[in-house]
Amino acid sequence: MEKIVFRKIVFVAFLLSLSCLLEGEARMSGDVTIQRGGSCNNDNTCHDTCPGCRITQCIFRQCVCTRCNTPRSSLRIESHM
């Protein structure tokens, strides 16, 4: 009985450490953008919705775009004088 409890604790600790590792990796990459604007059926659809991204994938019908060169937004300042 004690061995089963110990194995479960070790397994949960392993899953928790794996989760933390993956979260830290995602934070360090910093260039992952998940498109939420619509569903996708294949990777080509994601390529069209993620212009400027080197890698586009359709995962679980959701676009995942990585290594994106986001264009700088052109801000116009209007003065009301």
From Swiss-Prot:
Keyword Disulfide bond belongs to the record: yes
Gene Ontology annotations of biological process type: defense response to fungus; killing of cells of another organism
Protein localization: Secreted
Gene Ontology MF, one: mRNA binding
Taxonomy, superkingdom: Eukaryota
Leader peptide range in chain numbering: 1-26
Residue pairs linked by disulfide bridges in the UniProt entry: C40-C58, C46-C63, C50-C65
Gene Ontology CC annotation, any one: extracellular region
Key words, A-Z: Antimicrobial, Disulfide bond, Fungicide, Plant defense, Secreted, Signal
Recorded coiled-coil stretches: none
Principal place of residence: secreted
Family to which the UniProt record says this protein belongs: Belongs to the DEFL family.
Protein name from the UniProt record: Defensin-like protein 266
Taxonomic placement: Eukaryota, Viridiplantae, Streptophyta, Embryophyta, Tracheophyta
